Every structure is written in C-alpha cells, then in structure tokens.
C-alpha cells in the first residue's frame, strides 16, 4: 500500500523473467462451488491454451463446500487453485487475484458468473486495436440462481468502440458488472487495487470510475457476460441495515475527486438522486415482504443521499404506509 492511498493494495509488476500469457482469468470464490462448474466450463470452452491464458481459482477459505474438488474434476492441471489460509473478505481476495495474475489482461470472474462464447476473442480485439485503452467491457445479461436470463444491461452506444465522455456516464451510477470487464494489468499497477474502506458495496464501481478518470475505455455491444443475481440479496444484512447505501454514499464522496471541478457538484447531485431513488425502491420491496426494519433503514439512507421534494414525498408516503401497518399489526394482536 502507498502512503498516498493507504487503503489500496499495491499491485507490483510481474517479474521480468516470468513467462506472461495474454490473459489472466482469475476466479475469486467463497461458498459457491455449486456454480463454479458452470463458471469454469464457460471459460474452458474458450481456452486458447496455457501459453495464452492463465486460469486460476482463488478461494477465500470456503466453509460450506469444496471448490478445489470442482477445479480438479473439471479443470485438472489446466486450472490453478489457491486457497487463503484464513477468510480475508472479498476485497482482499480480489487483491490476491490481482497479485497472483501474470497475464497482460486481467479478467476477474466471480465463481458464480459466466462468459458467453466470443468474450475473450471480442474483448482482446478491443485491446489489440486500441493500445491506449485501460479497460474494455461488454454488455451483460442478468441471470437467476437457476441460470435463467432475466434482463440485459442498457446499450451504452450503438457500435463497439471507445466510449466518449465515459467518465461523466459511469459516475452517475454503476453501469458495469465485474464479469463483463477486462483491465490491463499495468492499470492496476498504476492505480492500485480495490479500496478497502468498503464493507459490502461500491468497491467495484469506485474502481471503474477511477479507471475512467485516467484511461479511455472500450465497449463491446454484444452481451457476452452473465451476472448472477441471488434471491437472498434482498434479505441480506447489508440491505436490511442500509449498509449498502452507506457504502454507496462513501463511494460518491470518493469519486468526486476524479471529476472536473466545474462539473463535480452537478454530477454528484445527480448520482445522489439516483441512489436515493434506488434506496426507495429497495424500501418498497422490503415493505412488501413485511420487513419494516429493513424498509425504514432504506428510507433513512435515501433521505441521507438526497432531501429534495423528489425524494421526500415518496419517502413520506412509504413511511406513512409502514406506520399504519404497525398500528394494524398491534390491533390484530389484541
């Protein structure tokens, strides 16, 4: 870690005498071995060979399954496996992935996500044709726990190529899911790893904004990555306590320094408004499930993001519903 950014792990360059492939596909895992087979299969189906691609699973000391057995069964000697000596948390596990990578291009692929045919070929084309870019990402699809596709990410532009004015777009909201993006290793070497100040959300978005502030970014219009959503995400502790939005507010404050001074205030307000509405959306879903505690916390975080009438009115309306529901619940008990 540097003195300037003590919360970001330094990513040292690869030793000069190390053989380097083009790709490092680094797969962080934690208690997701039931999905890891699908993840590995999607990568191995596009494997150009060990001289071109490093494939390695980095496990954060899983307690509920055996990812090493899956690697040995499906990948044999082709896929490397490394396990932390103790659970270190997802951000430090990401750091380990970056530090153990040898390739010129790094793809962090969560152990429950997948890539579609053509992912590595198409994104490598972006780097080959545009030596100045720091990262490339593609449109992505969301899938559920059973692998069924649910919806597709927004189309950022009509044709593949370098994105224009990308910093002012990515700073407004999270537009990239991790399995869809590839980053030059030298970019991580220059900018450092993921910021450790986040507890559950925001570390990836902050990184993508950081990269956009320093490098051009290339975009592939074909949806070649699959991001898995879990039904448990809404009931997770980070959402019920509001920590997810707390992390987002922290990220918004951090990325402000990457913005042009004359535009920083306006863009920051737009971002805060977006995530205030996002929190109210969570609050509404939690309220519908009868989770008053979680709904109240999301309403609170929404108002901490933005206290304009656009946020206050729906927050007040939802709070009133929760209040009357509590009264009715008490009446029913008598």
Q: Which functions belong to the PLM regions below?
A:
Residues 1-42:
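N-proximal low-complexity "stem/linker" segments adjacent to membrane-targeting elements
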Residues 3, 160-169, 223-231, 236-263, ...:
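Catalytic core of nucleotide-sugar-dependent glycosyltransferases
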Residues 41-52:
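Short, acidic, metal-binding catalytic loop of nucleotide-sugar glycosyltransferases
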Residues 59-69, 86, 110:
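A conserved acidic beta->alpha catalytic loop
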Residues 67, 84-101:
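Glycine-rich, basic loop-to-helix element that forms the pyrophosphate-binding segment
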Residues 106:
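Short aromatic/hydrophobic "clamp" motif used to bind/position activated sugar donors
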Residues 118-151:
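Conserved donor NDP-sugar-binding/catalytic core segment of glycosyltransferases
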Residues 160-243:
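Conserved nucleotide-sugar donor-binding catalytic segment
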